[in-house]
UniProtKB/Swiss-Prot annotation:
It catalyses: L-serine(in) + Na(+)(in) = L-serine(out) + Na(+)(out); L-threonine(in) + Na(+)(in) = L-threonine(out) + Na(+)(out). Belongs to the dicarboxylate/amino acid:cation symporter (DAACS) (TC 2.A.23) family. It comes from Vibrio vulnificus (strain CMCP6). This is Serine/threonine transporter SstT. Involved in the import of serine and threonine into the cell, with the concomitant import of sodium (symport system). GO terms for biological process: serine transport; threonine transport. It is a multi-pass membrane protein. Keywords: Amino-acid transport, Cell inner membrane, Cell membrane, Membrane, Symport, Transmembrane, Transmembrane helix, Transport. InterPro entries: Na-dicarboxylate_symporter, Na:dicarbo_symporter_sf, Ser_Thr_transp_SstT. HAMAP family: Ser_Thr_transp_SstT.
Amino acid sequence: MQHNSLIARFAQGNLVLQILVGIILGISLALVSPSSAESVGMLGSLFVGALKAIAPILVFILVAASIANQKKNQHTHMRPIIAMYLAGTFFAALTAVVLSFMFPTTLTLVTGAEGANPPQGILEVIKTLLFKLVDNPVNALMSANYIGILAWGVGLGLALHHASDTTKAVFEDLSHSVSHIVRFIIRLAPFGIFGLVASTFATTGFDALAGYAHLLVVLLSAMAIIALIVNPAMVYVKTKQNPYPLVFQCLRESGVTAFFTRSSAANIPVNMALCEKLKLDEDTYSVSIPLGATINMAGAAITITTLTLAAVHTMGIEVDLMTAILLSVVAAVSACGASGVAGGSLLLIPLACGLFGISNDIAMQVVAVGFIIGVIQDSAETALNSSTDVVFTAAVCESEAQKAKG
C-alpha cells in the first residue's frame, strides 16, 4: 500500500522540482563516484531513446488527426508562426554578428573533425530537404525524418478530411492514446535527466572547455539575448501583453528538458504536452511544433555565425558591414536547413566560411572546436530552439484569440 502511495506522490509531484533534484543528484554522483555516474548514464540513454521512439508516430498521428477533423473555415494560423520562426532565426544570426564584432574571438585550431562530410553549398542543403519531403513514409517514421513525416501526415489528413466520421474518430482516439504514452514518458524525466547529467559530468568534465571560455561566453550571451530580450519583444509586438510569464514557463518546462536531452526531436513530445497545458489550439500546435523542430533554428544560426566569425578573426580577414549582413542571411537560411544535414549546425560552418574564402581544411578545424564545446553549445542551442517553438506558437494563438474576441 505504501509502495503505491509513493508512486502516486511521485506522479502528482511538481515535475520541474523533480528534474532539479535529478540534476543536483547527478552532479553530486559524478563528483563522488565518476564510475557509478557513467553506469547510470543508461537511464539517460533509455529516456532519450523512449522520447525519440514515440516522437515520429506522435507527430504523424497528431497531424493526420487534426487535419482530418478540422472543421470547415477553421484556420490554423501557420503563416504568422512561420514568419516568426524565420524572423527569429534571422535576428539570432544578426545578434551573433554584433556580439562577434564587439567581442572578437580567436581560436587555437585543432585537427579537423574526422569522417565529417559538410555540404558543398546551399543548393545541396535545399536538395537534401526536398528529397526528405518525398521520402518513403515508413522510412520517414523509422529514420525520424520530420519533414517527410509532416508531408505524409498532412497528405493523409487532407485525404481523410472527406472520410466517414467513424474513421476520423479512430484517428482522434489514436492521437489521444499516443498522447497518454507521451505523458507517461515525460513523468520519467527526473530519472532520465539524472542519468544524463551524471554521465556527462563524469565523462566530459569541464576542463576541456576552459580553453574556449571566451567563445562560449559570446555564444551563450547571444542565445541569452535572443531568449530573454528578442523573443519577448517579438511576443509583445504580437500579443500586446507582458511576454515574460510565457517565456519563463517555456524555458522552465521545455528548455530545461531540451538542454539535457540535446535533441529537438526528443523534445517534440514535451512541447506538445506544454502546448496542451497552455490550452493552445491543437490544430495549430500539432503542425507548428514539429515544423519548428525542423525550421526554427535560432540557436543554430548563432552557432554558425559565431564560429564562422571566430574563424574570420583568427585568419585576420577584414569584414565589411554588407558582408556581415550577408553572413546573417546565409546563416539564417542554412540554419533552417540544419535538419537536412547529418551533424546539424556545426557541419554548416564550412558553407558560411566559404563566403570569406576560408579553405575547407581550416573550416573543418573550426568544426572540431565546435565538437569540443558541443556539450554546452549543443545543449544551449537545443534549449533555445525548442523552447522558442512553444513561445511563438503560443504568441500567435493568443493574438488570434484576441482578434476573435474583437
